[in-house]
Every structure is written in C-alpha cells, then in structure tokens.
C-alpha cells in the first residue's frame, strides 16, 4: 500500500501544479475533508473548487514524500508552492500536506494543510478574498 500512497501524493502535487482540480478531487473519498489554517475544516470538493476559483496559476516544486512506518495510513507531501492568485499576486511558501487514507484503500479521507508564509498579513488578505466567494460557500470559516 505504501507504493500507492506515494503515487497518490506525487499525482496530487503534479495535478496541483497543473491546476487540475478535477484530478485532485478524484483522489479523495466521497466524503473526504481538508483542514486549512485559514479556512478551517471543509469538504475536499468544496475546498478545491474554491481554490480553483481563486487561482491564476500554480508552480509546485516537490521537496520530499514521507511514508509511514508499519501499517499506518498516512503520508506527507513536502513541497514549495508558488501560488498566483487571480489578482496576479504571487504567494510563495513551503507546505507539508498530511494525507490520511481510508482503511484498505488509496483514497484520501482527510488532508491537513500545514504551512507558514513569509508575509502572513498579505496571505490572510488573499485567503479572506478566497473565503468570501459567495457562490462557493461551504460552511467553512475564515480565521482572523
């Protein structure tokens, strides 16, 4: 199963770099979730729809993939994310995405986004714009 986990993480990073949100959503279980520092817990499909609506382009530079020891059902993708939002602002940060897989499958049940940005105030402003999109409201919350 570890080979499958690694393949999922690499496919995720490739799809994110290509802004291919349909492929990303296909990696998740139907009720999969994403927890974001700025948006909180929300359904994965809604999170990636919202991200896609706010994104002009992505450049993903993989750094490493961390696989579990034993029979644990999680793995971590570590990468540099150069995110260009629709207004043209470029936000660059390193990310460690913690994937939790559904038992006996290679479907992502939960994704926890772990990152820091060099300019948190600017990043929060961009994420607030992202979270304020009424057409994509999903019950997620924006952090202050």
Which sequence ranges carry the predicted segments?
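A beta-strand edge to alpha-helix "cap/lid" segment located at domain peripheries
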Residues: 49-144
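Intrinsically disordered, low-complexity segments enriched in small/polar residues
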Residues: 3, 10, 19, 45, ...
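Short, low-complexity N-terminal intrinsically disordered segments enriched in polar/charged residues
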Residues: 1-30, 129-144
């Amino acid at each position: 199963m570890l080979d499958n986990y690694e393949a999922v993480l690499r496919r995720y990073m490739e799809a994110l770099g290509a802004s291919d949100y349909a492929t990303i959503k296909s990696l998740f279980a139907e009720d999969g979730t994403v927890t974001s520092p700025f948006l909180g817990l929300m359904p994965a499909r809604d999170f990636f729809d919202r991200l896609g609506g706010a994104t002009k382009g992505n450049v993903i530079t993989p750094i490493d993939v961390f696989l579990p020891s034993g029979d644990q059902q999680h793995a971590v993708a570590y990468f540099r994310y150069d995110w260009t939002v629709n207004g043209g602002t470029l936000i660059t940060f390193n990310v460690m995405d913690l994937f939790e897989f559904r038992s006996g499958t290679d479907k992502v049940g939960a994704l926890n986004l772990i990152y820091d940005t060099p300019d948190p105030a600017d990043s929060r402003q961009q994420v607030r714009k992202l979270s304020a999109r009424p057409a994509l409201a999903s019950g997620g919350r924006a952090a202050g």
